[in-house]
UniProtKB/Swiss-Prot annotation:
Name this polypeptide is given: GMP reductase
Gene Ontology cellular-component terms listed: cytosol; GMP reductase complex
Organism listed in the record: Acidovorax sp. (strain JS42)
Keywords for this protein: NADP, Oxidoreductase
Gene coding for it: guaC
Family per similarity comment: Belongs to the IMPDH/GMPR family. GuaC type 2 subfamily.
Superkingdom as given in the UniProt entry: Bacteria
Length: 325
């Protein structure tokens, strides 16, 4: 098995077949909807809030609302009232089951539900998927997070419509340091490994440090890429604004950090400060243009043409050119 990550992989270009990069289509289908980009902001309190999710939905982007200090039922009602699709997060505890029961009682169905726990290959996730499929079968269920082919196979067999791959590769995640487990440092390899057995979409979650990493994720099997740090630190971001030596920053912390939990218990996340980057819309436009460029380098016109390219591994035992596999 090849072990590599984003920083030691480069994709190999093929003959360009478009007159302009603007001809390239970056859109992707997930469930019954098509979205402008294969990118979704991380469902974290310092990355998304109700206002940002509404704007994303209204402008053709996918989103997943976080599950912390939120009335999910009211959120879904509010999104539907504005003509937007609803995409929420659930855990696997009793209050999450109570939320599902409220959806049923009020005749409400969120279009997307992400079962979002740190170690998603678990009986507790199996039970929640089963419950969701029985109670609100129309919802598209994303389950995670996982990092092995066995986990992807199980989640799909349990009824998940998509899986979220990535255990601890994120910028504010310290799972590998605290536990000795995870995909940090080899997230791209883990994605490739999992994609080989997947029959349903994969959302690659974590480890993205540049826009080129999005193309690499698509090449190795991702339908959608969840991004935290690149979306944190915008003017609209919900994180607290902090001034340091005359420079403005936004707080960005992991969902399993003590800052998010409000207590120091089972902590696997940390807090950092992200320099304020400007407006979210400008970053999304730049992302779209960069992914269009990636598609043009792949010799194609559509996003999934990126999957047809070869790649090289830089350094290490697996260094050299790797033909399409």
């Amino acid at each position: 098995m090849e072990i590599f990550d984003y920083d030691n992989i480069l994709l190999l270009p093929r003959k360009c077949r478009v007159e302009s990069r603007s001809e390239c289509d970056t859109s992707v289908e997930l469930g019954e909807r098509r979205f402008r980009l294969p990118v979704v902001p991380a469902n974290m309190k310092t990355v998304v809030d109700e206002k940002i999710c509404t704007w994303l939905a209204q402008n053709g982007y996918f989103y997943v609302m976080h599950r912390f200090d939120l009335d999910n039922v009211q959120f879904v009602k509010d999104m539907h009232a504005q003509g937007c699709f609803a995409s929420i997060s659930l855990g696997v505890k009793q209050p999450d089951y109570d939320t599902v029961d409220r959806f049923v009682a009020e005749g409400i169905c969120p279009e997307y539900i992400t079962i979002d726990i740190a170690h998603g290959h678990a009986d507790s996730v199996k039970n929640m998927i089963t419950y969701l499929k029985a109670k609100i079968p129309a919802a598209f269920v994303i389950a995670g997070n996982v990092g092995t082919p066995e986990a992807v196979i199980d989640l799909e067999n349990w009824g998940a419509d998509a899986t979220k791959v990535g255990i601890g590769p994120g910028k504010v995640c310290i799972t590998k340091l605290k536990t000795g487990f995870g995909t940090g440092g080899w997230q791209l390899s883990a994605l490739k490994w999992c994609a080989r057995v997947a029959t349903k979409p994969i959302i690659a979650d974590g480890g993205i440090r540049s826009h080129g990493d999005i193309a690499k994720s698509v090449r190795f099997g991702a339908t959608m890429v969840m991004v935290g740090s690149l979306f944190a630190g915008h003017e609209e971001s919900p994180g607290k604004t902090v001034e340091v030596d005359g420079e403005l920053y936004k707080e960005y912390y992991g969902s399993a950090s003590d800052f998010n939990k409000g207590e120091y218990k089972h902590v696997e996340g940390k807090r950092i400060l992200e320099p304020i980057k400007g407006k979210l819309a400008d970053t999304l436009t730049e992302m779209e243009q960069d992914i269009q460029s990636s598609i043009s380098y792949s010799g194609g016109k559509k996003l999934m043409d990126i999957r047809k390219v070869n790649y090289v591994i830089l350094g290490g035992d697996n260094a050299g050119e790797h033909l399409l596999m």
